[in-house]
A protein has these predicted regions:
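Positively charged n-region of N-terminal signal peptides that target proteins for export
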Residues: 1-4
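Hydrophobic h-region of N-terminal signal peptides that target proteins for export
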Residues: 9-18
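Early extracytoplasmic/lumenal segment of secretory-pathway proteins
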Residues: 18-89, 100-101, 206
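Alpha-to-beta junction loops
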Residues: 69-75, 134-136, 197-202
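A conserved helix-loop-strand patch within extracytoplasmic ligand-binding domains
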Residues: 87-161
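A bilobed periplasmic-binding-protein/Venus flytrap-type ligand-binding module shared by bacterial periplasmic
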Residues: 111-120, 234-251, 268-272
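Ligand-binding pocket segment of bilobal, Venus flytrap-like solute-binding proteins
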Residues: 161-228
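Extracellular/periplasmic juxtamembrane helices and adjacent flexible linkers that interface
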Residues: 244-324
Length: 324
């Protein structure tokens, strides 16, 4: 009887033990393939590490899900404000979280690029061409997607360099938005609309995504256009102290993110067309990445907080420009 009871108790305990051996990485929409490859590399180098599970959606949708109870151990997002809200509103990590890892907790970065169909029939070379008559564009909704916000801000940065007055800049943005064929909630939805549903002449998304599409669907059918001036897109990462402390996974979560800065991980990132911090790896993959003048969010809008309030809040400039 005692033996049977002990066996039953051990059986009940096993799921709890297994749960402690898992890390949940909540990430942005188009990072599925990247983190499948990174997790395989990490687990190969760390055979005793917890099993890594993934959750993917638009960066802002992920932040909302976590605030509503998704017990992520780590976040690998594409916009700083989506981590900030987890600190300020959710109290899941300290306000100085960007100081805990190198490069403001952004182990890699990208920029916004264009994917056009074979032969570039609409002759797309820069941001101005996106608003030409007869051009139909696809990118994620800036309301729900960090990817989409970078596209909007990249266009604004171009407008600031090209047009003298704010009225002219806003007129360009309004014209650009009028050329959007579909606003998907996330980057992968936008890719599906462009590639599989054949909507639009130009897909605007991260440089890593446009090159990934050419690899997956065939380089002969698409061309990549990287504008001479674009926006610096940082990819912040963080462990969520409140969740990891409750689950006993803090050390594992830290190690998982710190390994992103290692040479093998940086090489994997570069292979997947992300721009990296490691100078040796940068030099190895230099031919993959065209020279671009990268403007920061701060260059364009002052700060993320200011940008979110002025452009993406309800009733902000984005909403105003979309009114017909």
């Amino acid at each position: 009887m005692k033996k049977a009871l002990l066996t039953a108790l051990l059986a009940l305990a096993l799921p709890a033990v297994a749960a402690e051996k898992e890390l949940l990485n909540a990430s942005y929409d188009i990072a599925r393939e990247l983190f499948a490859r990174y997790n395989a590399l990490y687990e190969k180098e760390h055979p005793d590490a917890p099993k890594i599970k993934q959750s993917h959606a638009g960066s802002s949708k992920q932040a909302t899900a976590i605030l509503q109870g998704l017990k992520a151990d780590v976040v690998t997002f594409n916009q700083v404000t989506d981590v900030e809200i987890l600190a300020s509103k959710g109290k899941l990590l300290p306000e100085n979280w960007r100081e805990r890892l190198p490069h403001n907790s952004s182990p890699y970065y990208s920029t916004t690029a264009f994917l056009v169909r074979k032969g570039n029939p609409k002759h797309i070379e820069n941001w101005g061409d996106l608003a030409k008559e007869g051009v139909s564009i696809v990118f994620p909704n800036p309301k729900t997607s960090g990817n989409g916000r970078y596209t909007y801000l990249g266009a604004l940065g171009y407008a600031q360099d090209t047009f003298k007055t704010e009225a002219e800049q806003h007129a360009y943005l309004k014209d650009l938005l009028a050329h959007v064929a579909v606003f998907d909630t996330g980057g992968r939805g936008a890719t599906t609309s462009f590639v599989e549903r054949k909507i639009g002449d130009v897909l605007i998304t991260f440089e890593s995504e446009v090159n990934g599409i050419r690899q997956e669907y065939g380089a002969a059918d698409y061309e990549v256009v990287v504008p001479k001036i674009s926006i610096l897109s940082e990819f912040p990462v963080a462990w969520l102290d409140k969740n990891t402390e409750a689950k006993g996974t803090t050390d594992a979560a830290k190690d998982y993110l710190q390994y992103l800065y290692s040479e093998p991980a940086q090489r994997l990132l570069a292979e997947n067309y992300y721009r990296v911090r490691d100078e040796k790896v940068q030099a190895e993959y230099k031919e993959r990445f065209p020279d671009v003048q990268l403007k920061t969010v701060e260059d364009i809008g002052g700060s993320w907080e200011q940008v979110m309030k002025e452009h993406f809040a309800n009733g902000g400039l984005l909403d105003q420009l979309q009114k017909r």
